[in-house]
UniProtKB/Swiss-Prot annotation:
Family recorded in the similarity comment: Belongs to the plasmid replication initiation factor family.
Coiled coil: none
Gene: repE
Biased composition (Basic and acidic residues): 1-18
Name of the molecule in the record: Replication initiation protein
Region (Disordered): 1-25
Top-level taxonomic group: Bacteria
Gene Ontology biological process terms, A to Z: DNA replication
Amino acid sequence: MSKKAEEIQAKQSLEKENSNFSKTGYSNSRLNRHIMYTPEPKLHFDAMTIVGNLNKNNAHKLSEFMSIAPQIRLWDILQTKFKAKALQEKVYIEYDKVKADAWDRRNMRVEFNPNKLTHEEMLWLKQNIIDYMEDDGFTRLDLAFDFEDDLSDYYAMTDKSVKKTIFYGRNGKPETKYFGVRDSDRFIRIYNKKQERKDNADIEVMSEHLWRVEIELKRDMVDYWNDCFNDLHILKPDWSSLEKVKDQAMIYMLIHEESTWGKLERRTKNKYREMLKSISEIDLTDLMKLTLKENEKQLQKQIEFWQREFRFWE
């Protein structure tokens, strides 16, 4: 964990203690609790979709190239459309002029996970596929924060009213949490990445825990990738620190019975959201913001590599 990360957690904990003493009136036992440090998460883009237009000349050139390139598997080929997978199925490519004209949208789409591509494969994809497109841009970016910590012990919520879905594991603990719906401009997933890899017989994870907070951004929201989760909170609230038994009971119910939120009016919801934040020593989203700030320039270079001039980031 970086020194900056330790400082922000220590400062945050102190601020919460001072705030809680004046706002909620907690018991003396709260003052004696140890501050728990969480390792800084690893951050990367996990999925990208780039769309653009192929003019008639470039569509012909690209179709000819793809029909002979050994890195590409081409199918559904017609004069005005084709589908393909490239680089051992790691890249999906689709061109459909008729559908694009009918829906008034760009006619070519390229989908891939940059983490699964080598530098050489990225260069190949940029030079041989993406550079054929005009008026290109991102319509999907996924930000992934990987924590070597057990996030099932945390309580996640948003300040906004969005649909929240929770799936539980065999041990009765939360294993996956969704905020929003898949078709929305922002869809947040918090899930046990280690368990997912185990279920899929994927690469073995050596860490004791591996959880991922994934923020899927679509359409206009991709422009706000560096400022897209200010309303999200991942907390460890201590309901027993509250003085009033009524508040303890309500907070306990809201944490353990999510459906209770739907029975409250807006003002009451806001009251208890603020109370939950005030009785938590840590909000992991502060660590996420710090990590994002430290990596922002590097991530921006990756975006610029795909969008602009041909140059690798350092």
